Every structure is written in structure tokens, then in C-alpha cells.
Amino acid sequence: MFVNIRRDLHQIPELGFQEFKTQQYILDYLATLPSERLQIKTWRTGILVRVHGTAPTKTIGYRADMDGLPIDEQTDVPFRSTHEGRMHACGHDMHMAIALGVLTHVVHHPIRDDMLFIFQPAEEGPGGALPMLESDEMKQWMPDMILALHIAPAYPVGTIATKEGLLFANTSELFIDLIGKGGHAAFPHETKDMVVAASSLIMQLQTIVSRNVNPLDSAVITIGKLTSGTVQNVIAERARLEGTIRTLSPEAMEKVKGRIEAIVRGIEVAYDCQAHIDYGSMYYQVYNDETLTNEFMQFVEKETDVHLVRCQEAMTGEDFGYMLARIPGFMFWLGVQSPFGLHHAKLNPNEEAIDVAIQLLTRYVTWKGNHKVKEEER
């Protein structure tokens, strides 16, 4: 059933804050469930679903992101995307299907505590977690703890991976516009060539990690797109660099940004041009609560047959970090065993992982949500 839900959602990927079909699909499914314990709110294109417990002392939050990516799908599956230039290439279709599976179980098999299911838009950009967290709708239903997962193509089905503390990096988009003076290729001395300026800037940016960041820290600066020029015999008046910054600490992020700004000022002087920097969307690090994460890992090892890997931190960016900065909780990787990675046009995760995740999470939230009962019975 939830594999079919995943396939339905896979066919209708939508970009951030445009998830209208996705939102309606989830609302239509929720309407088929018994409503006695359900409360539903919408926030922009997101959804909050509160499942009331039998004798709540806390609220357990579970977050699933909803948006797709601007990628042309290149798989040959019969349920491939029907939206041209859009694809669920980061597994958010699976995230939603798993959340609905857990939600359905809790509705039919109530636990003591309340649960809040958060279907969050715009994880890929411009970022939905922070504004959703600050919304009146969520403030009224703020959970006491929160958890989430992310699919991991590199891990086999039946495996999850996580760790206490830092799991994902601080990330920031990076956009730099250079403005010079165009002209005929035969008269370069009368121009200010922004292709040359951009080339120099890209090379200088690479020295930040190697010469300005402590080798014991971690940072990555990637320029993934360079746009400049019109035709081969015209010197480019403008250039635009687009990329990302990733660091394992907020302090390193500030240092990297400071060096970028200093280098860009030097480019302005050296190439007699103007430059503008925009950092775009910025995501805070995913930092797992040590007590809750350790408790979860012990539960997985003792109470399930799921294989647990204690992984290292990754340079991945996730706006779930904003939620973890305010609500204790954790995130983990779910193995889906795909030869193609996240954000790849041929990503094809193994759907058997959906049932693995639903069974694991329903057992965990049932244990966690009834934990007070067990303590009182001792």
C-alpha cells in the first residue's frame, strides 16, 4: 500500500512552496482514516497532523519533507515523473510514504502520547523548516521531541546509520555577480573582461579551504555553475558564479564567508569591476541530541533486526537542523541501496526500505510513546 503511495507521489514532484498536488494527495489520504483522534492544519503547502494519544504526557514529532528537484528524470520505471523537468531525486516521496505509514499505524493502534506529523515543504529551497517552525500553527503544537530520516543510496536495505552530535553540515548557497565592461574581442584593452575575472576568482576561492581553514576542521566551497558571455567574439561584460559552502561548525562558516568577501574585494580592484555577493538560503547544522540518539540506537540494537551503523558526519545540508536547534531529537540515514546517488537523474531507491522504515519507526514510537506506562508498572 505505502509503496503505491510512494509511486503516486513520485509521479507528481513539485518545487518548494509549489507542492499543491502533493499537499492535496496527502489530505485526500488523511480523509480516509478514522478522524476521532486526528487534528489537521495546513500551513502554506505543508501539513501538520496531530494524532491524540490515550493519556499524553508529551508530544513526539515526526518530520517528512515534500518537495522535488528541478531535474529531468532518466529512470525507466513505469511510475516516472509526469512533471517535465521535475523529479523526486532526493527521496522525499519515500519520506512522505513512510510518514503516512507510521501515522496510519498510530491512528489504528493508539499510543499513550500525542504525535505530531510534520509534512514540510521546500527543504531543497528556499527552506521551509524555519518559517514553518516559527508559524503560529506549529507554535500551538510544538512537540517535545522530534525525529526524521533521510534515504541513503550507499547503505543496503535493512541498515540505518546515525550518530550522536553533529550529523550534517552547516550549508549556504553562494551567488557572486561580476560586472565589468563588454566590447569587441579585437579591442580587449577597451574592456573589462569578466570571464577572466571569474576564472581568477574561482581559482582564488579554492585557496580558502587549503590555506585559511584549520586542517582539523572541514569545509567545502563548490562553484557548480558559471554563466558569462554571449558569443565567441564579444568580451563578456558580466559573469555569475553559483555554488555552495559547507562547514562542520558555524565558526568555520563565518571564517569562510569573511575570506570570500575579502577575495571578492580584491577582484574588484584587480579587474576594475563591480561585484555583488548573495548567500541565498542557509541551513543550520543537523545536531542530534546525544541522550535521545543514544537511546534510539540502543533500541534498534536490542529490539529490532535492523543493522545499525555508527556513521561519521557528512557535508550534506538539511534544514531539519533548524528544528533540532529548538527541539531535542535526531535524524538518521535509511539504507535504500541504489547505484545512483541523491540528486541524480537515475536515482532508483529500493522500495523494500519503505516497509523496513515503517516497521522500525512504529515499534520505536510505540515503545517511546508508551514508555511512561512501562515505568509506572515496574
From Swiss-Prot:
GO terms for molecular function: N-acetyldiaminopimelate deacetylase activity. The keyword Hydrolase applies. It catalyses: N-acetyl-(2S,6S)-2,6-diaminopimelate + H2O = (2S,6S)-2,6-diaminopimelate + acetate. Pathway: Amino-acid biosynthesis; L-lysine biosynthesis via DAP pathway; LL-2,6-diaminopimelate from (S)-tetrahydrodipicolinate (acetylase route): step 3/3. Keywords: Amino-acid biosynthesis, Diaminopimelate biosynthesis, Hydrolase, Lysine biosynthesis. Pfam families: M20_dimer (PF07687), Peptidase_M20 (PF01546). Disulfide bonds: none annotated. It comes from the Bacteria. PANTHER family: N-ACETYLDIAMINOPIMELATE DEACETYLASE, PEPTIDASE M20 FAMILY MEMBER. This is N-acetyldiaminopimelate deacetylase. The lineage of its organism: Bacteria, Bacillati, Bacillota, Bacilli, Bacillales.
